[in-house]
């Protein structure tokens, strides 16, 4: 396929739509066909909402297999962290803007049953990395595990010993792949939508080790997803807490955090198909609109990759 070159406008305008329509577009397989068509024809957003591709395709360093989560390193622009999903070692990989491997840091005391996402956010000791071992394709009832450790440096031999926290969904189990942490320390999960509605859940804080906490439902984001490409696979919050990005295999939605958490105001959304990702799994966003997308890939022929976008986020 032909990718847009650096600096080319990726989407002339992000489409601003009514909240119900925004949810249909995030989970496009839901709802009547007429609704989906109406969303597709929604007028372009007013104002400076636009994203452009800066780097359309970056191959990640060879040790990275089946990348499943991503976070931007706040100390070094252009550096990001990722990890593999189930079957991979409990390791964080630090990579440069062009995918070059900067470090391989085991998470001490952790195991990788099915790591799905990661986030960087505040903790009692300063700034920590949160790794979510929450994969649950069968949506059975089970403990979800969150590991927390101070953010390492790329050259560290291992993280400090990770704290382990456990929680469960009340009632039936759910599959979730998106996690984000806000500046005040609130931790949120987004369910995938394959076995039930796409939902936003809060992990109770302060985190409590040695017990199993109960997750708190915040709101439904969309009905159950009917198409593979609309499953929610990643989430990320900007360091200033103003923006939350959610992604599916084929779409990106950027919310004002306050809107996502309860007001129901519109999201800004865009189609990711032009990037040609192979199983897009992760998203991370900076306060200035720098946005990272990571795809898992498949085997040696389509390894894990990343793309960099720059989005002009409204200041008001």
Kindly label every feature range from the protein language model:
Residues 9-10:
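Short, positively charged and aromatic/hydrophobic N-terminal segments
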Residues 30-316:
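Sequence/structural signature of beta-propeller domains
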Residues 2-3, 15:
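Position-driven detector of the extreme protein N-terminus
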Residues 14-37:
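Secretory targeting and sorting signals
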